[in-house]
Amino acid sequence: MSVVLPLRGVTALSDFRVEKLLQKAAALGLPEVKLSSEFWYFVGSEKALDAATVEKLQALLAAQSVEQTPKAREGLHLFLVTPRLGTISPWASKATNIAENCGLAGIERIERGMAVWLEGRLNDEQKQQWAALLHDRMTESVLPDFQTASKLFHHLESETFSGVDVLGGGKEALVKANTEMGLALSADEIDYLVENYQALQRNPSDVELMMFAQANSEHCRHKIFNADFILNGEKQPKSLFGMIRDTHNAHPEGTVVAYKDNSSVIEGAKIERFYPNAAENQGYRFHEEDTHIIMKVETHNHPTAIAPFAGAATGAGGEIRDEGATGKGSRPKAGLTGFTVSNLNIPDLKQPWEQDYGKPEHISSPLDIMIEGPIGGAAFNNEFGRPNLLGYFRTFEEKFDGQVRGYHKPIMIAGGLGSIQAQQTHKDEIPEGALLIQLGGPGMLIGLGGGAASSMDTGTNDASLDFNSVQRGNPEIERRAQEVIDRCWQLGGKNPIISIHDVGAGGLSNAFPELVNDARRGAVFKLREVPLEEHGLNPLQIWCNESQERYVLSILEKDLDAFRAICERERCPFAVVGTATDDGHLKVRDDLFANNPVDLPLNVLLGKLPKTTRTDKTVAPSKKPFHAGDIDITEAAYRVLRLPAVAAKNFLITIGDRSVGGLTHRDQMVGKYQTPVADCAVTMMGFNTYRGEAMSMGEKPTVALFDAPASGRMCVGEAITNIAAVNIGDIGNIKLSANWMAACGNEGEDEKLYRTVEAVSKACQALDLSIPVGKDSLSMKTVWQDGEEKKSVVSPLSLIISAFAPVKDVRKTVTPELKNVEDSVLLFVDLGFGKARMGGSAFGQVYNNMSGDAPDLDDTGRLKAFYSVIQQLVAENKLLAYHDRSDGGLFAVLVEMAFAGRCGLDIDLNLLLAQTFITNHTALSQSLRTEEVKALAEWQETIARTLFNEELGAVIQVRKQDVADIINLFYQQQLHHNVFEIGTLTDENTLIIRDGQTHLISDNLIKLQQTWQETSHQIQRLRDNPACADSEFALIGDNERSALFADVKFDVNEDIAAPFINSGAKPKIAILREQGVNGQIEMAAAFTRAGFDAYDVHMSDLMAGRIHLADFKMLAACGGFSYGDVLGAGEGWAKSILFHPALRDQFAAFFADPDTLTLGVCNGCQMVSNLAEIIPGTAGWPKFKRNLSEQFEARLSMVHVPKSASLILNEMQGSSLPVVVSHGEGRADFALHGGNISADLGIALQYIDGQNQVTQTYPLNPNGSPQGIAGVTNADGRITIMMPHPERVYRAAQMSWKPEGWTELSGWYRLFAGARKALG
C-alpha cells in the first residue's frame, strides 16, 4: 500500500473555460452555481517522504502541502477529477520521469487531479449530470473526496488465465465466449477453432481466443478484400485485392515495396541526408545515400466515434509507427489528416439543409468529434514532431432512397510520407535464437479488442466493450522510440534491427506472431518480461492490450549491448520478451503461475481460414433529374460557402505544426495573407537540395450515392488534378494509396464496392498509375434503438485516394494565389466537357436536392493529356496560379483564388454557359434564338450547373502574351475545345460573374470571405478562447494589417559568415535536446550552413558525463515538447538542471563564460527562461505561459528586430520579416515581477502587424504577449531566447510565403551567420 501525499496546485480552469461549462450546464437545465477549480497532485511513495524531498516537490510542481484536505459540505459540492482508477496517465509517466531526473528518490508515481467546487443546491441526479460534464469517462474518474484518491495507487493481485471448455461444451461454449468477449468471430471461424482444438486435444485459453480474434479480424486480415464475390447470381472472376494488385502488376516501375510491409516504398533519389554520425561522437554530417519515399494512409474510425480526442490521437500515432517500422526502420516526415462526419448542427449556426436524426448515446456527436478529434490528431503530430500539411473535412447526413445516409461512424484518416535508406527497405530473415524485443511504452489496460471492435457495425457491440477498445496516446514516448529507430538505421549496414513491426490492433498478441511468422519462425516468450504500468493485469490483458507507442523488433544477441546503449541514451524503455525458434510454434510462458497461457502452432493462429464468400445484388439508386431553375444564384453561392466541404478550414490547420523538421515547402496556407486553399503538400528531401515529395487527396463519397464506380474514378481524377501543378514529370511517377470505406452487409453495398474497385483498377491502369498500398474499413454503419424505433445511419461507399510523388524541383510548385501582375488572364479547362453533371454536388447538398447524374472521369486519355500540358507549363514557369475544380464547383475555385490573392475578379462565362447548354439541351439550342434560350428555365438551370458542377477541371492564371502558345499546347492534346478564357483580375474588392453584359453574381469579396470562414470561426469560438476567435474573424478584409511583408536592412544574398567558413575554423555548437524535443535536426542544419560544427547533445549525455558543455563555444536549446510539457513548457527540463548540482554548475559556468553564445528557441526558449537564476544579466526576464487562445498556434507571423544587445541578432536590427511560430505556451508572463516589464528588459524580437506596428491583436500576435514580446536577450547580448523558429525558415524554399528577391537564403539565415561572425 502506497503512502499518498496530496499537494495543492494553482487554479485549473481559465475564466472562459468556466463560462463555457456554465453555459453547457444551463443548456441542460441545471440550477445556477458558482464554479471554482484547482489542480491537486498526488504523490505515491513506499514510505513517507522526508521534508527536503517534499520541499523539492513543492518547487517542482508549483504546489503547496496542506495540513488537511478540504471537504464538501452542504451547498458546496466537490468533484475530484482524476485519471481513471486502475490506469496510469501519460501525464504521470512524464512527471515521474522529471522527478527521477531531478534526483527525487523514493517516489513511485505523481498523478494530477482537478478539484472542481460547485457552490449551490444540487440533487443527486444533477450531480451526476455535472460529473458527466466535467470528465471524460474514457480516461478519467470523478471521486467524491480526497481520501478516495489513494485508490490511484492500489495494487491488484495478478490472476492466471481462464479457459473455454470446447472439449466438454463443444461449439456452444465457444459461441457463448464469442458474445461475452466481443470477439466478432464468424460461424466459419468458430468451426475452425473447434476443429483445431479438438485435434490438439486441449481447450483454448481466453488469451488464445482473444489473440485469434484480433489477428483474424476484418481489420487485420482484410477478409472481404480477399473474398469470393457472387453478384446478381454470378461468381466474379477476381477478388478485390486481386484487382488492386493488377495496377501494380501493370505499372511496377518506381515502386520498391508493395503489399508486404507496414507501408509502401517508392523510388526517391540520391541525396545528402543530414543526421548525427555515431562514429564521430554524434557530430552532424551530410551523408550521400539513395533515399526512397514511404507512403502510408490509415483510418481510425471506430475509436474516433467513441472518444474523438484519443481516437484521432492514436490514429495519427499508429500511422506514424507504421511508417517508422517500415523495412528495418525509417523516418516519418509529413502527415495528412481528414474527417468525414454527419451534420454538425452548430448551436446558433444550424444550416437550412441540416437534419438531426439522433445518435446512440455512447458515441460522440459530429460537432464534438470535430471539436475534439482534430485537436487529438494535431496534438499527437505536434508532440511527436511531424508536420501535418494536407487534409479535408466533409459533412453529410441525408435521407436518400428511404435510408438515412451519413457518417455517425466517422471517417478519421491519418497518413503521410517518410524517408528510408535504400539499404533498409526490406526486412531481413530472423534467425533462430534472435532476440524478440518490445520497444517503447509499457502495457496497460486500454484498447482491449480494438481490432475486432473496429470490424463491427457501430452499436452492435456492448457499449462497455466499445469503450474498452479505444486506446490512449503518449506521443512523447513514441518520439523517444523513433529516436532509437533513427539511431539504428543511421548506422547503415551496421543497423542492429533485423525486422521491426509496430504494435497496433491486438497488441503484442498480433505484433509478435506477425514478426516471427513473416520469417517462418516460431517463438518462446516470457509474459512477465513485458513492461507494464499497471499491477494485477491477467495474461489476456498483458498479451492483448493495445497500449500505444510500442514496436516489436528482432536483433541478434551480440548486438544487445549496443542496442541497450542507444535506448538508455534516449531514455526509451525496452525489454527482451522472447527468442525466435525454428519450430513454427508459439509459446507464451507465465513464470508467475508456471503455466503457458499460449501454446499452439502458428499455423493455427495465422493459418488458412475458410475463404469468405460475399453475396449481393445491384440496388440501383432512384433517378431524379436535376432542377434548379427557381433557385437564387447569389443565395446558392452563400449556402455553398458555408458547407464544411467548401468552407475555410482554418480551425483545423492552425492547431497543427506545419514546419517542424525544417523540410516543409508547401503547406495548406497560401500567399501573403495565409489563406487555406492549397491543393497539395510539398516537402523537400533534404537541406541542400530542391528535390522533394508531394502528396494530394481525392474523395467524392456523395457521388457514390448516384454512381459508385464514377465516384471511384473521380477520386483518382481529383487526386491527379490536385497534384498536377507540382514539378513531377511523367504521370506514372505518381503512386496512389486507396482507403476504402463501406457498409458491407447492407444490401447493395458489397456490389457497389466490387464495381468501384473494378472501375478504379481499370482507370489506374489506363492512366499508368498503380496502388501499392491501402486499407479498408468495411463496417461503416451505425445502428441503435431509440425507444420503440430501431434506427440506422449507413455511410455511402467512401473511397479516399492519396497521391504521392517525387518532385524534381519544389520551387516550381504553383499555388491558387492569384498574382497581381499586369496583362494576365484566367483560363478554365473543363474536363467535364460541358456535361455539368450535378449528382452529389455541394449545391445539391445545401438544398437537400440529391438528384441528377453523377460526374465522372469519362476519358482517362484526356486527363493524361491535361496533366501533361500542366506539367509542361509548370516546367516552363508559364503558370502564375492554378486551382483545380472540386467541391463548390467553378464558383468556389474563383472565390478561393480571389481570397488568396486579395484581388477582384471580372468573370465572363458567356462561352462556357453556351457550351453547357448545347451539351445538355442540343435540340433546344438548335431550334431557338439566343434571346429565347435565355428566357427558359433550362437556361437558369444551366447557370447553376455551370457555376456549381464538380466535374474535373482547373482554372489557371497566365500572362496574356502566353495565351496563344498555351492554347496551342491544349490543341496538340485535342483539348482546345474545352479551354475558355473567362476573365481578368481587377483592383476592386468585388467578384463579378456575368453572362456577357448580364451580371449573374456581383458581390463584395470581404462579405463572401466572411461567409466562407463563418463555420471555422464558430467552431473556433466553441473550442478556444472566443475573444481570440472573434479577433481573427474581425481581421478579414483588413489587408493592410494582416499582410505579410519583408523589410530587411541588409542584403539577403550576402553571406557574412563566408569569410569565417573559408578560414576553415568551425566553432563547436551543442545542439541540446531533452526527451520529447523534436526540432534538433533543422537547428543543426542551420548552424552547419553558417559554418559551425554541430553536435547532437542529449541531456542524458550531460548527466552521464559523456559530454561536457565546456567543450563547446555555443549552445542551442531546441524546440519540441520536453517531457510533454507536463509541468509547464520547458519547466521540467529546466528543473532537471537546477535540481542536479553537477549540471547546475556546468550550465552556470557556460552561461558565465564571456566567450560563449546561447540560443534558446521555442521549448528551448521556455527552458532557458526558467534558468534565469543562473544566467547573468537576466533581471526582469519573463516566463512563458499558455497562449491567450488556450490553443496551440502554428502561424507564419510578422516580427520586428528592434535594437538590442543580442549578438546573434545584431546584423538584423531594424528589419521586419515573417517567421514561423509553433507553440502552445508562448505568452511572455511577468507575474514574477509584479506584472511589470523592466525598461532594460532586452526585448530582442516583437510581433508586428502589416503596418510594421507592434501589435497585441490576435492572431498577428499569436499568444498575447505584452508589447508583442517574441524574444529577449540578456544584458551583454550573449544569450538570446525566442519563441519563433528561425531555424525552420533559413532557406527561402522553407517559407510558405516569401518576397520575390529571396532565392536560396531567407532573411533568417542572417541570424545564424551573425552568430558565426560574433564568435570571430
Swiss-Prot record:
<dbReference type="InterPro" id="IPR010918">
    <property type="entry name" value="PurM-like_C_dom"/>
</dbReference>
<dbReference type="InterPro" id="IPR036604">
    <property type="entry name" value="PurS-like_sf"/>
</dbReference>
<dbReference type="GO" id="GO:0005737">
    <property type="term" value="C:cytoplasm"/>
</dbReference>
<dbReference type="GO" id="GO:0005524">
    <property type="term" value="F:ATP binding"/>
</dbReference>
<feature type="binding site">
    <location>
        <begin position="311"/>
        <end position="322"/>
    </location>
    <ligand>
        <name>ATP</name>
    </ligand>
</feature>
<dbReference type="GO" id="GO:0004642">
    <property type="term" value="F:phosphoribosylformylglycinamidine synthase activity"/>
</dbReference>
<protein>
    <recommendedName>
        <fullName>Phosphoribosylformylglycinamidine synthase</fullName>
        <ecNumber>6.3.5.3</ecNumber>
    </recommendedName>
</protein>
<dbReference type="InterPro" id="IPR029062">
    <property type="entry name" value="Class_I_gatase-like"/>
</dbReference>
<keyword id="KW-0067">ATP-binding</keyword>
<feature type="binding site">
    <location>
        <position position="884"/>
    </location>
    <ligand>
        <name>Mg(2+)</name>
    </ligand>
</feature>
<dbReference type="GO" id="GO:0006189">
    <property type="term" value="P:'de novo' IMP biosynthetic process"/>
</dbReference>
<feature type="active site">
    <location>
        <position position="1285"/>
    </location>
</feature>
<feature type="active site" description="Nucleophile">
    <location>
        <position position="1162"/>
    </location>
</feature>
<dbReference type="InterPro" id="IPR010073">
    <property type="entry name" value="PurL_large"/>
</dbReference>
<keyword id="KW-0658">Purine biosynthesis</keyword>
<dbReference type="InterPro" id="IPR041609">
    <property type="entry name" value="PurL_linker"/>
</dbReference>
<feature type="binding site">
    <location>
        <position position="886"/>
    </location>
    <ligand>
        <name>ATP</name>
    </ligand>
</feature>
<dbReference type="GO" id="GO:0006164">
    <property type="term" value="P:purine nucleotide biosynthetic process"/>
</dbReference>
<keyword id="KW-0547">Nucleotide-binding</keyword>
<dbReference type="Pfam" id="PF13507">
    <property type="entry name" value="GATase_5"/>
</dbReference>
<feature type="binding site">
    <location>
        <position position="679"/>
    </location>
    <ligand>
        <name>Mg(2+)</name>
    </ligand>
</feature>
<keyword id="KW-0963">Cytoplasm</keyword>
<dbReference type="InterPro" id="IPR036676">
    <property type="entry name" value="PurM-like_C_sf"/>
</dbReference>
<keyword id="KW-0479">Metal-binding</keyword>
<dbReference type="Pfam" id="PF18076">
    <property type="entry name" value="FGAR-AT_N"/>
</dbReference>
<dbReference type="InterPro" id="IPR055181">
    <property type="entry name" value="FGAR-AT_PurM_N-like"/>
</dbReference>
<feature type="domain" description="Glutamine amidotransferase type-1">
    <location>
        <begin position="1069"/>
        <end position="1320"/>
    </location>
</feature>
<comment type="subunit">
    <text>Monomer.</text>
</comment>
<feature type="binding site">
    <location>
        <position position="678"/>
    </location>
    <ligand>
        <name>ATP</name>
    </ligand>
</feature>
<feature type="active site">
    <location>
        <position position="1287"/>
    </location>
</feature>
<dbReference type="Pfam" id="PF22689">
    <property type="entry name" value="FGAR-AT_PurM_N-like"/>
</dbReference>
<dbReference type="InterPro" id="IPR040707">
    <property type="entry name" value="FGAR-AT_N"/>
</dbReference>
<keyword id="KW-0436">Ligase</keyword>
<feature type="binding site">
    <location>
        <position position="718"/>
    </location>
    <ligand>
        <name>Mg(2+)</name>
    </ligand>
</feature>
<comment type="pathway">
    <text>Purine metabolism; IMP biosynthesis via de novo pathway; 5-amino-1-(5-phospho-D-ribosyl)imidazole from N(2)-formyl-N(1)-(5-phospho-D-ribosyl)glycinamide: step 1/2.</text>
</comment>
<feature type="binding site">
    <location>
        <position position="722"/>
    </location>
    <ligand>
        <name>Mg(2+)</name>
    </ligand>
</feature>
<keyword id="KW-0315">Glutamine amidotransferase</keyword>
<dbReference type="Pfam" id="PF18072">
    <property type="entry name" value="FGAR-AT_linker"/>
</dbReference>
<dbReference type="GO" id="GO:0046872">
    <property type="term" value="F:metal ion binding"/>
</dbReference>
<dbReference type="Pfam" id="PF02769">
    <property type="entry name" value="AIRS_C"/>
</dbReference>
<dbReference type="InterPro" id="IPR036921">
    <property type="entry name" value="PurM-like_N_sf"/>
</dbReference>
<comment type="similarity">
    <text>In the N-terminal section; belongs to the FGAMS family.</text>
</comment>
